[in-house]
């Protein structure tokens, strides 16, 4: 059930907020990319990355996204649920290895059985490539137990395409409390997720995997964060958001398998918002 605060943000946003979001929503300027940390670009281009992850770069825009969040090589970064695929782990863990810290907050052995195999794959991968992942810290992020980092120790908490799941399961408030506790004052929460339609309520598209951007902002600000920026780095105007199996119709999931595959391949991965929040003191 939506709170009055959330409803107000979703259905009666002021013109001031609208202009603010539009002003922040432009793609990252070329000048900003030119000033991005060359270390991030180097690890994005490094040969250790899996071909499957590299193939997703045109849709996930890692350089633009991490530059927008302003991650630096001496940062302490907690990534929520990197999983065994480790798309951002492949980039962030070696980038932060010498001067910063990368923390993988993942489901562990206490999680549901369906997640156990993935967690074991993650641990095996870390152990098998110590030159890249030898300093990765693995912490817990289960539905009922969160020990992601010491209180006030993280410069960044980053979460990619997880918010919709927590909203569906009524776990979002608990997750945001954990993030707020882990971040230092002024620390950054970075959120990327499938952007929902503005002509539908959040409830109406809940099971599709999409989240209204204004709804996401309202929920997160209610938890003690302040919106600091909006990026269109991960936008996809081809995404009509009316697919038979929701966001999972599109790549890389292709839930319909070969049915209309060329159509959904032409659309590409989902339209996504990229939001940056600051922890309030």
Region annotations inferred by a language model:
Residues 103, 186-194:
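Conserved beta-strand signature within the Rossmann-like core of class I S-adenosyl-L-methionine
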Residues 116-145:
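S-adenosyl-L-methionine
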Residues 147-157:
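A short acidic, Gly/Pro-enriched loop at the edge of an enzyme's catalytic core
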